[in-house]
Curated annotation (Swiss-Prot):
Secretion signal span: none
PANTHER family membership: NADH DEHYDROGENASE [UBIQUINONE] IRON-SULFUR PROTEIN 2, MITOCHONDRIAL, NADH-UBIQUINONE OXIDOREDUCTASE 49 KDA SUBUNIT
Protein name: NAD(P)H-quinone oxidoreductase subunit H, chloroplastic
Compartments, as annotated in UniProt: Plastid, Chloroplast thylakoid membrane
GO cellular component, as recorded: chloroplast thylakoid membrane
Keyword GTP-binding: no
Lineage: Eukaryota, Viridiplantae, Streptophyta, Embryophyta, Tracheophyta
Keywords, ordered alphabetically: Chloroplast, Membrane, NAD, NADP, Plastid, Plastoquinone, Quinone, Thylakoid, Translocase, Transport
EC number: 7.1.1.-
Regions crossing the membrane: none
Disulfide bonds: none
Gene name, Swiss-Prot/TrEMBL: ndhH
Family: Belongs to the complex I 49 kDa subunit family.
HAMAP family from the UniProt entry: NDH1_NuoD
């Protein structure tokens, strides 16, 4: 008589997470292979939010394309607008007035804070802390009030223009923004008291999703993902675009490379952004907010009384100019990392090629490696610490 046979083969389970899972930060689908609660494999499935943004750019002038770009990373729209106008400005050698450059820096840093706040709330909710999720909307609402006063829109601002910005800052806006800066610093202190030394929070994030500096460089990571791994690299210091070199601020970085380090980098970055905004507001120069030279047009023929074009004689056309026949790569330091554009001009008002380098897409590549041999619950922590928006990942 023989005893019962034991099956030594592990029974693996395949679980679909997403594309409508509440912790997926958009329409991301993960096919996860589990052995009990241990993650054996993870395959991200992308493309649910693909809208052909690069192809649309090839059939639009730069000014026509500006409203589209705010739909890439719809939580940090100032950065997508900035990269869209910076590329043709460099291609056409267009000078930006000093006042416009200061206004741009203020808007970019406010947008960085808003993006980091809306990362912090859902990240904390993912790992079980609901309270900060409601707190972050107080400060974020104040930032959106500032955006609405200056641009007319709370989101999707369409504020940047080639050679400057669409409108000057309204009366009283600078004082209102300075008041917000003072208030927000107390808000960050409150968040850090609530979160940073909370033992349950530390259990969930410390030592989870570790990336070494060498790995971060090899995978092409950027932004807080790179700086949390011991690499002090920030394009605002490296490239010195706009007028960042005129302000006193420090690159924030950590050396541990885990989810806690990425949290600490983003929290410190918000403090540095406030420092930059305060210096820009206090030192903002006078002068024009746009370069009117860009708005020159070729002289059109005089319309006759019975001509079809006569009815459009009072319409103001959008400014166009030819993109010279050359290649150019332009980049900015967005909240999630290096946002870049590879632009090819072809003596036409339309770009011949408009390649987008989204930081979220590159940073997401390392997710399968990070979650292997981790617990199922750690997927939420690691994915949240990467900070992705599917609008820019899928484009």
């Amino acid at each position: 008589m023989t005893g019962p046979t034991t099956n030594t083969k592990n029974d693996l389970m395949i679980v679909n997470m997403g594309p409508q899972h509440p912790s997926m930060h958009g329409v991301l689908r993960l096919i996860v292979t589990l052995d009990g609660e241990d993650v054996i494999d993870c395959e991200p499935i992308l493309g649910y939010l693909h809208r052909g943004m690069e192809k649309i750019a090839e059939n639009r002038t730069i000014v026509q394309y500006l409203p589209y770009v705010t739909r890439w990373d719809y939580l940090a729209t100032m950065f997508t607008e900035a990269i869209t106008v910076n590329a043709p400005e460099q291609l056409g050698n267009i000078q930006v007035p000093q006042r416009a450059s200061y206004i741009r820096v203020i808007m970019l840093e406010l947008s960085r804070i808003a993006s980091h706040l809306l990362w912090l709330g859902p990240f904390m909710a993912d790992i079980g802390a609901q309270t900060p999720f409601f707190y972050i909307f107080r400060e974020r609402e104040l930032i959106y009030d500032l955006f609405e006063a200056a641009t007319g829109m709370r989101m999707m601002h369409n504020y940047f223009r080639i050679g400057g910005v669409a409108a000057d800052l309204p009366y009283g806006w600078i004082d209102k923004c300075l008041d917000f800066c003072d208030y927000f610093l107390t808000g960050i202190d409150e968040y850090e008291k609530l979160i940073t030394r909370n033992p349950i929070f530390l259990e969930r994030v410390e030592g989870i999703g570790i990336i070494s500096g060498e790995e971060a460089i090899n995978w092409g990571l950027s932004g807080p993902m790179l700086r949390a791994s011991g690499i002090s690299w920030d394009l605002r210091k490296v490239d010195q675009y706009e007028c960042y070199n005129e302000f006193d601020w420090e690159v924030q970085w950590q050396k541990e490379g885990d989810s806690l380090a990425r949290y600490l980098v983003r929290m410190s970055e918000m403090r540095e952004s406030i420092k930059i905004i305060q210096q820009a507001l206090e030192g903002i120069p006078g002068g024009p907010y746009e370069n009117l030279e860009v708005r020159r047009f070729d002289k059109t023929k005089d319309s006759e009384w019975n001509d079809f074009e006569y009815r459009f004689i009072s319409k103001k056309p959008s400014p166009n100019f030819e993109l010279s026949k050359q290649e150019l790569y332009v980049r900015v330091e967005a909240p999630k990392g290096e946002l870049g554009i590879f632009l090819i001009g072809d003596q036409n008002v339309f770009p011949w090629r408009w390649k987008i380098r989204p930081p979220g897409f590159i940073n997401l590549q390392i997710l399968p490696q990070l979650v292997k041999r981790m617990k199922l619950a750690d997927i939420m922590t690691i994915l949240g610490s990467i900070d992705i928006i599917m609008g820019e990942v899928d484009r």
